[in-house]
Amino acid sequence: MAFDRELWDDRFSVSAVPAFTCPRCSKGTLQFDKKQFWKVEPKFSVDAHGHEDWDPEWVDERFAMFLKCSAEKCGEIVVVSGSASVEQVYDEEYGPSMESLLVPAMMVPAPPIIRVPERTPQEVQAELQLAFQLFWSDLGASATKIRTSVERLMDHFKVAKFKRTGGKLKPIPLFTRIETFIAKNGKVVHKDHLHALRVVGNLGTHSNAATRSDVLEAFQIYEHALDELIGKKSTVIAKLAKKLKQK
């Protein structure tokens, strides 16, 4: 699954619902059926139509939909809900027009934003799945889960979590754990990748300043890092290296 940032815009129209990857089988895509779509305008929004200055952009609706996996043997159903508003959009051929756009606040189970290698430890996968789900409702929390998954990745590589100081066990900062991992196992490029994920996670944890772009870039970096560290690519390279060493 190639990373496509446009797939993860914060809003889309009913006529252009993204074809997300199925969170269960990872093979099918989630299909939209208009018969499984509901949109309602609350009374406060309806009443506002009577205001002398009313504008279509005042409309504030709620929506819910089911997306079904295209793989016949899977058939997973994802529930999507959120708000809808009327906004001006631009078309190169027809010019500006008003269109109702859907802004998801929840997707359950959430589609995977990146491809996660099968060999990825379950503890890392669990944190990433939470990051995927929180992406739609709380970007800061999503960024924090990315950081937590890096902690679990360091656990997988048996990098120490605690050190004894003054007779007490104290947690080792993630910065130090990454440095230790790189010194023993990694490459300089992996150092940059992992520290970038740590920094984005810190933005989410401490200041809630992580933007949608920050989080998407972090996911993109993480996909590459996981593929190199524990995915098929790392296995293939390891085999090639072993073969060449025997010459």
Question: Where does each model-flagged region fall?
Answer:
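Short, flexible, mixed-charge glycine/proline-rich loop motifs
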Residues: 8-17, 57-63
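Charge-enriched, short contiguous segments at helix-coil
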Residues: 189-247
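Short, charged amphipathic alpha-helical segments flanked by flexible coils
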Residues: 105-107, 155-199
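Short cysteine-rich clusters marking metal-coordination/redox-active sites
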Residues: 22-25, 69-72
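Short recognition patches in nucleic-acid-associated and regulatory proteins
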Residues: 2-7, 24-58
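A long, hydrophobic alpha-helical segment
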Residues: 120-139
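Helix-loop junctions and short alpha-helical segments
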Residues: 71-72, 76-123
